[in-house]
Amino acid sequence: MQTSHYAAEKDMQDAAPRLTFTLRDEERLMMKIGVFVPIGNNGWLISTHAPQYMPTFELNKAIVQKAEHYHFDFALSMIKLRGFGGKTEFWDHNLESFTLMAGLAAVTSRIQIYATAATLTLPPAIVARMAATIDSISGGRFGVNLVTGWQKPEYEQMGIWPGDDYFSRRYDYLTEYVQVLRDLWGSGKSDFKGDFFTMDDCRVSPQPSVPMKVICAGQSDAGMAFSARYADFNFCFGKGVNTPTAFAPTAARMKQAAEQTGRDVGSYVLFMVIADETDDAARAKWEHYKAGADEEALSWLTEQSQKDTRSGTDTNVRQMADPTSAVNINMGTLVGSYASVARMLDEVANVPGAEGVLLTFDDFLSGIETFGERIQPLMLCRAHLPALTQEVA
């Protein structure tokens, strides 16, 4: 079974176009890099063979400080309120996003910090005030990722699931939510009246010191339409294993949606990096992780993905549950030597509409260090960076 799956991945890799670059491409290829911090246990590998660890502030502090040392542009944390179970208890143990990122804002100085708001759990006026507070802590380096919520048990357990019709109305809800945020961040006052929210001389002060960035991760048509109108950039999943440009149609859809609103909303693409000295050594690690897939946790994810029957077939959760590479929730996976991974990331940068990547690693601390020391120096799209100091991250 593993042999046939490997062959399928090789076919995908061989079919992917290989791009060549010239010096004149270098400026156009400048691409931002972020780290998707492991706010939940075990990061993004649903495998008994992957590193097993609990999320702590100290771990995430070490990760983000190391990322800042290696000139990463931003750090993002998700929010997860209930996990997948299984042998690995995958994502059963999670920190909270805003409080974690407030702490990380206080121990960093340059890197942009993003927290995720589960908008069903927090009124927009509270998020507006929390964001303004972290803006003050960070010196203007904070932004907010807005999510509508797809995993019904996260909200049912608290008695706040609004009913299954929410699946088809969630971006209507989010549209009102962000309008309240923009009112409060812009003028400090909101009298917004809508179907979901009613503000009556609602006040928030002080306002953020800089315009607050809002990001989203919409891949459905409704999600992209929302991002086109309100987001500063939009996250999307990479696709496949060693097929770095396979997400290009998604980026093109986002670009087209943004053009219809007269805005520029770039795509930031999610990838996992599994690197080693040679392609074969990296591939061996990937095969080892797949062999230990936590089938019980993966079955739970598949079950949850089938509960939303109203949002279409192009949602994030349906890609996460696809059996092709479910062991890491089907984010794009780059497996190879340091040079191979650098080349593939340069290919990502050459896709129209792609402005950045959000990276995860099989082992975050060693992975970020290896990326900073061995991969990033080989990337054309990061050639603009200053030389590293000799300080240990």
UniProtKB/Swiss-Prot annotation:
Gene3D superfamilies associated with the record: Luciferase-like domain
Record's catalysed reaction(s): uracil + FMNH2 + NADH + O2 = (Z)-3-ureidoacrylate + FMN + NAD(+) + H2O + H(+); thymine + FMNH2 + NADH + O2 = (Z)-2-methylureidoacrylate + FMN + NAD(+) + H2O + H(+)
UniProt entry keywords in alphabetical sequence: Flavoprotein, FMN, Monooxygenase, NADP, Oxidoreductase
EC main group: oxidoreductase
UniProt binding sites for FMN: 79-80, 145, 154, 170-171, 220
Entries under SUPFAM superfamilies matching the protein: Bacterial luciferase-like
EC number: 1.14.99.46
Induction and repression of expression: Up-regulated by the nitrogen regulatory protein C (NtrC also called GlnG) and repressed by RutR.
Any single GO BP term: alkanesulfonate catabolic process
Record InterPro entries: Luciferase-like_dom, Luciferase-like_sf, Pyrimidine_monooxygenase_RutA, SsuD_RutA_monooxygenase
GO MF term set: alkanesulfonate monooxygenase activity; uracil oxygenase activity
Family according to the record: Belongs to the NtaA/SnaA/DszA monooxygenase family. RutA subfamily.
Function: The FMN-N(5)-oxide reacts spontaneously with NADH to produce FMN. Requires the flavin reductase RutF to regenerate FMN in vivo.
NCBIfam families for this protein: RutA
Protein name: Pyrimidine monooxygenase RutA
Organism of this sequence: Escherichia coli O6:H1 (strain CFT073 / ATCC 700928 / UPEC)
Gene name of the record: rutA
